[in-house]
Amino acid sequence: YTIGLYKEIEKESGHSVGFKPSGGFYLASNDVWSEYLKRERSKARYMGLDQEFISLDEVKKKNPLIDPSRYLLALWDPIDGEVDPSGVTYAFAKAAKVHGGKYYTHTEVKDTKQKPDGSWDVFTDKGNINAEIIINAGGLWAREVGKLSGIDLPVQPMEHHYLITEAIPEIEAMGEQRLPIGT
């Protein structure tokens, strides 16, 4: 769904989201993560995505730097990739503007209230805004923003770790391939 949406937003906005498909896999080193990957694959299949389990030997072929003996299960996603977060944000904002929408930066939403006619009053730190439609663009704070409208969003921010190093020739030689995710 998301990849199709990115293409549509790029077309409507004329702005690239910077999508770089490279394929990627998810690795499970314990039973809890194995069960999680099985559930994720079931959801992906239901949505028509081509994720598939691959052998640990195939993992080694796709990424020779990985020791497959540490893992129990591997899930391959052929359309996995990366986007430019600022590009996605700008493309969505521009597409909204093309369709008559407005967006406000550096404006904290304090509360929202739906009126009987279906429109919304949005109370911000810079004054009140009336809108026919509101879009939750809260990012990491989407759950909290949703609560302002009485909506419980099942969004859970996840912590990821990043490591900055000098160039590693073996990783550079892999090109654009994403490094695996898992535990």
Give the location of each predicted region.
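A conserved short coil-to-beta-strand element within the FAD-binding core of flavoproteins
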Residues: 54-58, 63, 102-120
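Generic secondary-structure signature for well-ordered alpha-helical cores
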Residues: 4, 8-11, 15, 46-49, ...
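Helix-loop-beta segment of a Rossmann-like dinucleotide-binding subdomain
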Residues: 15-26, 40, 60-99, 121-125
